[in-house]
Structures are given as structure tokens and as C-alpha cells.
Design a protein with these regions (language model features):
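Aromatic (Trp/Tyr) and acidic
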Residues: 7-84, 89, 95-99, 107-178, ...
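Acidic, glycine-anchored loop motifs typical of Ca2+
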Residues: 203, 207
């Protein structure tokens, strides 16, 4: 039998449920139920005894599952759960439990910075040298250079530097950047009081909240990715992924890959949002961001056709492909309406919305949910969310009702998935995909949104349960955030942490999580066919389809912990 708890802990007033799980014996019989569960202080004093309640068979894990609720324990302290001779990892009950985690999740972004030296006073033992400062070239010219048709000096060179390394590689991708930024900037917009922390970054103390200073580093890189006509390069990468070397040792040619309409629309959206967010702190940047957004929106109007992106056959870096840009265009139109107040953007947004079947997603593959956040902003911001909405025209008011209904309908659908899970996770068995933890956290953001819109505790409890899953209530028995919990994963697929020669792992990385269809050689070799999807996980750095990290897996965790940290 195994006992699964949130290894970080539980708020004094939150829902608290321990999961007990067993697999069937060789005969296939249902295991014998655990008789009792004891909630004890870490020094072994039993404080509460409960009889577990049988949930049933959990298909995603292949386990027979029991639950024991111990929500009546409120006293701050350190605890363990016992059942017969099995003991859980220690955990805390109290207040402020997510504060340090929220900080480490946010500080991860600093450790992803490209184009600058990370100094010991900010990075500690993870200090490293400046990287990727050489000029970039256009793919259209570089492929001619590779074919011997032109010389190096015949290519245009672009001094584009900065931003965050996207993931375990050293590429930087426009659509992924926009999505990660949107998660974080909206988290700041909706839960600003949770972002009063000093992240100990070079900009700390400059009069701007540290999280906004960190995001500004990425935004300033993204501004450089816009061409003279308003198009936006899809990505800035080398031809192929770097070897597992430190960033400054990756000296291969950086390439600007062609403009995609997804990148242009995402760029227009995030710059319009940034203009609103940064106006109180940096008027000049806010103005620059809005002008850039308008320029890219004009580009979209001049190019109504879908312009996708596919990797050239010579390239193996992240593709971030798509089959439509309608959701991206929707997001761009809505952000520009919210920033400028000009009704034609709202009209554009409603026309695009009416073409879509899915409207509540927050990932790079579908950004439609961000349009809903922009539209419903006054209903989600703390200073206005408790007041009657004051929309300026009938179209906006009616559209807001529709989007509110969309969010709540999707939240209720997710609640139904959670009820069917022995581990209270918002994934059906077939949804344990590459980056499954991103899906968990994106849905936690939607549940958080539903709570603010509708003030029903069931949504807050469900969002909390998703962090329980991420932090240890899962059949792999890991906390999926480095440095968070007694059994946190330690070996991300990340070039820096493998090449730096340091035994400790940078804290605050979110793992991609279990993948029912492993897609890397190591995982395919080690995970046996028929393994239940929730158990298709290995804490091995080579397993990039299970254990990579990326900015847009951290960003929904930043949002969710900001929501859970408010007034706690």
C-alpha cells in the first residue's frame, strides 16, 4: 500500500484528503482495505484516526483507491499519515505555505535568462557566463549559405539578444513566450498582492514589482522579433539542438525562422496586454508596446490568410506548429479592444469567436481563453470583481455573458473529470500526454477563474486539489516541482542542470509529468507496455517526453499558486 499526500502541505482551512492506493495481487483480487488511518505529529503523537472510504478502481493509475478526509485538523505544525506499517512523507499545515514556492517558481525565469551573465549575488551556486550574444541570420539566407550559394558576409546580421531560454534547450520561441507572459501578467493583474516578493534579481528595488521586471526582460527580447512590416519571426534558434553544454558553450549560428501568423497575432495580443500592465511603471515602454501591437495587428489585417510554420527538414528545434490562427487573432483583437477601447476590435473579436468550437484554452496550441480573460478583466480584478460589471456597450455586455458561461461550463466539465479520479486530478486516462502537468495546471487556472467569477468554493477546492496532485498526490509519488517536498524530482531534461556539474538542482522547475505515450528512447525502453498512464514517469534527465521543463509549464503554476496564496 502507498500513502499519497501533498508533500508541501495544506492550508489550515483548506480541504485535506489523503489517498491510499494498492494494486491488485497476482490473482487479480481487490486488495484488502486499510483498516484505519492515523494523522500524527511528526514526533509520532496520533491526533486523529479515520476509517478510509473506498473510492474504487482508478483506471489512470491502475490502483484500487481509498480516501481519508482530515480537513478538521487546523493547527499549524508538521504532520505525517500512518496506516499499519506505512508512513507518508512529512507535510505541513498552516498559513503562507505557497509563498516560498511561488517565489521559486517565479525565480526560475531568471535562471532561464539568455544573453547575460548570471552573477553569484543573484544566482548563488548556479551563476553562469553570458551566452548567445552573437548576431542572428535569416533562415532564407542561411539555407543558401548551407548550400554554398552565398558567403557568410553576404547574409544580413541581426543583433537580437535577451529573453528566456524556452525549455531544456536554448531556443527562444515567439508563441511560447507570449503564452508564458500572458499567464504571469494576468496572474499579476488578478492577484497583485501575491507578487510583493523580492525575487533577488538585478532589477530588484527599481520601483517596479520584481515579477514585472522579470517579464520585461522577455518582452524586450520579443519586441526585437518584430520585423519592419509588423511580422514576427516564429523563433530564434540554432539549426539543431545544442549538445548538453552550458549556454555560453553553445556557439552555433542563431537563426531567425520565418514569420508565422500565429506569432504575429500572439505578439499583438501580449504587447497590448503589456501596455496596460506597465503603464503605471514605465510609460515609455507601455507606449512602445502598444505601437508594436497596432503595427502587428495591421499586418494581420493585410494578411488574412493562415501562415503556419513547419520546421525545415534540416532543423530539429521546437516547431510550435498549428493548423489555424483564428484563436490567436481572437486574442489579439480582444486585447487591443481592452487597451484602446476602440469598438472595431471588439467587433473583430466577436466575429472570430463565432467561428470557434473551443474558446477556453490557455496553451500555446490554443490561446482562446486569454481573450476571455481580457473581455472579463473587470470581473476578475480584485478592485472591481465584487461590483456589478460596467460594460460600455451592449455588444460587450452580451459577449461577456457568453464568455462567462463558456468558462463556467468548462469548469463544471473539469469538475466531473476530477470526481471520477481517485487522485482528484483533472485528467481523464487518455489525457496523460506529453506535458500532462501543463494540462493539469492550465485547468487549475480555469478553475481559479470560475471561482472568482462565481464565488463557489467547489472551484477553489478543485484548483487546490490540482496543486495537491502536482506536489505528491499522484501515482508516481513525486512532487513535480524541484525543491518542493521530501520526494521532489531532481533530474530535469535541462542542458544547464546537466552540464553545470552541480549536484543540487535549481529549485522551482515544473516537470512535464507522466506521458501515457512515451516518445523518447530511454522512456520507451524503461516503461513497460501496458503501464497505466499516471505511472508513465521517470525522473531521468534523458526522458525529455516526461521530464523536460519549460517557461510555459512554470507560468500556469505561478498563476495557480498566486490564486491560492491570496489572503492566505
Amino acid at each position: 500500500m502507498k500513502i499519497y499526500i501533498n508533500q508541501l502541505g495544506y492550508y489550515s482551512d483548506s480541504i485535506k484528503t489523503v489517498v491510499l492506493a494498492q494494486t491488485a495481487d497476482a490473482s487479480g483480487s481487490i486488495p484488502q482495505a486499510p483498516e484505519t488511518v492515523q494523522i500524527c505529529s511528526v514526533d509520532g503523537i496520533c491526533l486523529l484516526e479515520k476509517e478510509p472510504v473506498y473510492f474504487g478502481y482508478d483506471k489512470a493509475s491502475g490502483d484500487y483507491v481509498w480516501h481519508a478526509d482530515f480537513s478538521e485538523i487546523h493547527a499549524p505544525g508538521s504532520y505525517i499519515v500512518k496506516s499499519k506499517d506505512v508512513t507518508s512523507y512529512p507535510f505541513a499545515i498552516g498559513t503562507g505555505l505557497y509563498n516560498a514556492l511561488h517565489t521559486s517558481l517565479s525565480k526560475m525565469l531568471y535562471f532561464q535568462r539568455c544573453g547575460m551573465e548570471l552573477l553569484p549575488e543573484y544566482a548563488g551556486q548556479f551563476a553562469r557566463k553570458e551566452c548567445h550574444t552573437a548576431p542572428s541570420v535569416l533562415w532564407s539566407e542561411y539555407k543558401k549559405y548551407l548550400a554554398g550559394e552565398i558567403q557568410s558576409e553576404d547574409m544580413q546580421h541581426f543583433d537580437i539578444r535577451g529573453g528566456w531560454h524556452d525549455a531544456g534547450d536554448y531556443g527562444r520561441y515567439s508563441t511560447a513566450a507570449a503564452v508564458a507572459l500572458a499567464h504571469i501578467l494576468y496572474a499579476y493583474r488578478f492577484f497583485p498582492d501575491t507578487f510583493d516578493k523580492n525575487l533577488n534579481i538585478p532589477e530588484s528595488g527599481n520601483g517596479m514589482p520584481d515579477i514585472l521586471s522579470e517579464c520585461l526582460y522577455e518582452l524586450k527580447w520579443l519586441l526585437q522579433m518584430q520585423d519592419e512590416e509588423g511580422g514576427v519571426y516564429h523563433k530564434q534558434c540554432t539549426l539543431r539542438h545544442a549538445n548538453f553544454v552550458m549556454p555560453h558553450e553553445d556557439t552555433n549560428q542563431m537563426i531567425l525562422y520565418p514569420v508565422s501568423s500565429m506569432a504575429v497575432a500572439d505578439f499583438a495580443a501580449i504587447m497590448a496586454l503589456a501596455s496596460r500592465i506597465y503603464y503605471p511603471y514605465d510609460h515609455d515602454f507601455a507606449t512602445q508596446a502598444l505601437q508594436a501591437a497596432l503595427k502587428s495587428y495591421d499586418w494581420l489585417q493585410a494578411h488574412p490568410e493562415f501562415i503556419g510554420f513547419t520546421n525545415p527538414e534540416e532543423t530539429n528545434t521546437g516547431e510550435y506548429d498549428d493548423t489555424s490562427d483564428l484563436d490567436e487573432r481572437l486574442w489579439a483583437a480582444m486585447e487591443l479592444y481592452r487597451t484602446t477601447g476602440e469598438k472595431h476590435y471588439l467587433t473583430d473579436a466577436k466575429t472570430l469567436f463565432d467561428t470557434l468550437d473551443i474558446t477556453t484554452e490557455f496553451g500555446w496550441g490554443d490561446v482562446s481563453g486569454f481573450a476571455g480573460w481580457a473581455l472579463l478583466e473587470q470581473e476578475l480584478m480584485p478592485e472591481t470583481c465584487h461590483s456589478e460589471p460596467d460594460y460600455t456597450n451592449a455588444l460587450e455586455a452580451d459577449f461577456a455573458k457568453v464568455y462567462r458561461h463558456e468558462f463556467l461550463t468548462e469548469a463544471n466539465r473539469i469538475l466531473d473529470i476530477i470526481r471520477k479520479s481517485g487522485y482528484f486530478v483533472d485528467l481523464s486516462p487518455h489525457e496523460f500526454c506529453w506535458g500532462s502537468n501543463m494540462v493539469v495546471l492550465n485547468r487549475a487556472m480555469l478553475l481559479s477563474t470560475a471561482y472568482v467569477l462565481d464565488n463557489q468554493k467547489k472551484y477553489e477546492d478543485a484548483a487546490m486539489q490540482q496543486m495537491d496532485y502536482i506536489l505528491g498526490v499522484n501515482a508516481s509519488d513525486y512532487s513535480y516541482i524541484t525543491g518542493a517536498g521530501a520526494h521532489a524530482f531532481r533530474h530535469p531534461h535541462n542542458r544547464v542542470t546537466e552540464a553545470d556539474g552541480i549536484d543540487d538542482t535549481i529549485p522551482g522547475y515544473v516537470s512535464g509529468g507522466p506521458n501515457g505515450k512515451p516518445a523518447d528512447e530511454k522512456a520507451e525502453w524503461l516503461i513497460l507496455p501496458g503501464t497505466p498512464p499516471m505511472k508513465c514517469y521517470l525522473d531521468i534527465w534523458e526522458c525529455y517526453s516526461l521530464n523536460e521543463i519549460t517557461i510555459y509549464w512554470n507560468s500556469p503554476a505561478i498563476f495557480t499558486t498566486a490564486f491560492l496564496s491570496r489572503q492566505k
